[in-house]
Amino acid sequence: MKKLEQIYEGKAKKVYATDDPELVIVDYKDDATALDGLKKGTIAGKGVINNQMTNRLMDKMEKAGIPTHFVKELSQRETLVKKVSIVPLEVIVRNISAGHFASRYGVEEGIVFDQPTIEFSYKNDDLHDPLLNEYHAIALKLATWEEIDLIKKYSFAVNDVLKAFWRECGVTLVDFKLEFGKTSDGTIVLADEISPDTCRLWDSKTHEKLDKDRFRRDMGGVEDAYAEIMKRLLDHDAN
């Protein structure tokens, strides 16, 4: 597999073409952003942790019957994935009130929902990723009804897998963001990453935040939190 030119750079990753038109290489960066890009910084070692954690969790999704773009981990920071066209819908699955949900609806953080809830946002930096519903997505031709139904099905299935896994690690899955893509034959697959960048993860006993909120809220201990959540994952899988 030959690595070719860079074809994309986002806030947290670079993407490179390969000599196979169906495959690309994702390179995870240590760069961090928050507050709609207004807050920028670096989290030492984040790229390594997010790459390796994502790959392990994507493997668990595949074993649970959820198709993903994951192919093979190449190095500490690089992974070979299927080339996809990203569906411009960010999916947010919430189990507990936190973050924008809490501030938007004027509720305290930490309220456990009777059942998980799902939100969509339009993946568009210029518009600051506005929330939208399924009818908006259809009107804007962002996806079809069939694709939206499948994305919802996969998102709730991901939630089931992640909640059970993190519970065994002594971690509560508060909420998380997902992205999906379409392969060249139109198959919907889970893409992007599953990491402390995209998930809210609290220690089950102390409710200590072990995710990017430590960066967003200037809480300190960001690198330690990322390292701790990775350690719990590795310790779990080693047993």
Question: Which residues does each PLM region occupy?
Answer:
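Short histidine-centered catalytic/ligand-binding loop motif
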Residues: L38-V48, L131-Y154
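C-terminal helix-cap and adjacent tail motif
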Residues: I194-N239
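Active-site loop/lid in soluble adenylation, ligation, and acyl-transfer enzymes
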Residues: K2-S121, L233, D237
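Short beta-strand elements
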Residues: Y28-K29, N95, V189-P196
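A long amphipathic alpha-helix within ATP-dependent nucleotide-binding catalytic cores
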Residues: L142-V174
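Conserved metal-phosphate-binding beta-hairpin within the catalytic cores
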Residues: V93, L173-D192
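Phosphate-binding core of ATP-grasp and ATP-grasp-like enzymes
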Residues: I111, P116-H128, N159-G170, S195-R200
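A short glycine-rich, hydrophobically flanked beta-strand micro-motif that places a catalytic Asp/Glu
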Residues: K72-R77, W166-K182
